[in-house]
Amino acid sequence: MKKFLSLVLALVMTMSLVTVSAGAKDFTDDSEITYKEAVDVISALGVVDGYSDGDFRPDDVLTRGAAAKIICNLILGPTTASALSAGTAPFKDVPVTNTFAGYITYCSQQGIISGYADGTFRPTGTLSGNAFMKMLLGALGYDSSIEGYTGANWSIAVAKQAINAGLNNSLKGSFNGVKAVTREEACLYAFNTLKATMVEYDNRIVVGEGSSAVAISGVRKDLTWNKGTLNDGKIKKDGYVQFGEQYFEKLVRTDDTDDFGRPASKWTYDKKDIGTYVNYDLLVSEYTTKVKGGDVYSDIGSVAADYDLTYYVDGVKLEKDAVKTQSSYIAKKNDDKMGDSGNGVLTQIFVDNDDEALTIVEINTYLAKTDDYNEKKETLKFNEIYGYGDVKLTKKLVKAVEAVELDDIASIKDYKDGDMVLLTIANGEVKTITPAETVKGTEIDEFSKQDYVNAGQKYSYAATGKLDGS
């Protein structure tokens, strides 16, 4: 006879594992922001602001006038840029009283932006990805005439150059230069501009004079710092001038790791922390099922397979012998399972070619039962965390889970005794809590140690399944 059960479904999932950014601005719609690192850094610099009601509105489209303001804020800094004004109307639809008149005038004079053939600028019009990238490339020093950003095929040249410069790094999906840019995409592209290397031209030939002068040829090269400069390394220590190093001397990026051991960037501005963020530019692949050594080899290639390996499980760095074993599995067509990878485990693989470093991180999702929230202490404890401490690679290294404090995770006050939740844990500290999907009074159609079928839906276990009772 089929038995009716109350089931807690610990579904295989990739939880939102973003390091808390204590120094970043808090927007009321933070949960809707996809490019959190970019928005945090760009807003901390004052390049893009939120609205008076506390919203950021990441999906609102960027206007042409607002884009000009962003460029001026990047090049001049927000304080200097805010003082810009227009003595005369730069375009027939941009009077001197227009909010963006000063920004538009400056960008037009610098050759960064242009209007339409009918003499208009259309400041309230939307801006395509290609058009915004063209402006950013201009800020980096790329010459429109030399690089072919003019004529019928200008957008192709811009898209190619922007991608080569890394201005679309971390974009979800492929870059669509025809689509209107959203506010958070603008932040992402501007953020990538901060990290991009500036350029200059040798043997530049210019024809014409004044506003009609046009460069027709020149040899482009990356801009380098003079030997001994103190600015090199504030974004990347490579001898080249990154945009942020040139225009935001108080902005500093340093290599770091997040709580789970993933390669990360720590950002500070004027010696104040903005936040620490996973460096997804180094992420090669990720899995939520079993990973074979041969899979890793295929993902990273033969060169990176010889890099020094660092291996973390739930924020715990594996000891030398364990790492040596895991490293031996990374070979062509090898079927040995990497670590404790499997259902319910997020395995991420990072490759840093500059430092010749390979990092593999496993993050388990645990099912837990909560105790009552302690209002006096503002803490939440757990009656049981299923499977925690049983992970073979870290069994001897695992720490007891500490109570979660309200200051760290605000949602804990909503839980009561016996609630089932999903946790991620790093070095004994709970980092994320998410309510588990619970199905009550339902019927199990089929059951095995690997999976079960409930109401026609098949669920795979993260651990070996057990059925209690007859």
Residue ranges and their predicted role:
Residues 2-36, 49-100, 110-130, 137-180, ...:
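Feature responds to low-complexity, polar/acidic, surface-exposed segments characteristic
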Residues 39-48:
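Mature N-terminal segment immediately following signal peptide/propeptide cleavage
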Residues 67-68, 129-136, 186, 343-345, ...:
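Amphipathic, non-transmembrane alpha-helical segments in extracytoplasmic/periplasmic proteins
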Residues 179, 185-187:
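Predominantly the structural core of cysteine protease catalytic domains
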Residues 189-192:
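Extracytoplasmic, non-cytosolic globular domains
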Residues 205, 210-470:
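Short, flexible, surface-exposed loop segments at domain boundaries
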